[in-house]
Amino acid sequence: GCHVTKHPDGKMHPLGAIASQLASAYANNQNQNENLVKMGWLDRAPDAKTPKSWKDEAASTQDRAQAYLNIHCGHCHNPDGAADTSALILDGSHNAAINRGVCKTPVAAGGGAGDMLYSIVPGAPDRSILLYRMESSEPDEMMPELGRSLIHSEGIALIKQWIREMPGSCPN
């Protein structure tokens, strides 16, 4: 998890907001990145799209699921994160289905794979490692491993729906 010290640059990185999470209006109805520039905290606003909200019922299930995984998993599951060796990229930076876990065999899940073959099996949430780990409360299996003591039923329902709606199949 984020206790791993072997990052590409050899440094630990704190959990915190990323540019896309601040690219939306807040209480003052301003883009928060632009507001930070006005306040002198940033030299310039980073390029960032306004993110979808996982709670936005008007957004597609795909967009909502991606937003949920980004906010809850992307801090470790990104190319420079503590879970970079898993090859499961959930921060929204890679669009290839395999990078998001579709038909991807686990690299570093160990016992956390629950005897399943793929991170995500389209149409089959009950055969998907991603959901298995989200539903687990075992410390060596549960995801995310930081900042969580309860199983998030709303998030699980969303990810189940997303996987159930996915077209395709994986090799047996």
Write out the residue ranges for each language-model feature.
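A short alpha->loop->secondary-structure connector
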Residues: 8-23
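Electron-transfer interface patches adjacent to heme c in soluble/periplasmic c-type cytochromes
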Residues: 23-66, 75-81, 89-171
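Short sequence/structural segments immediately N-terminal
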Residues: 1-12, 65-70
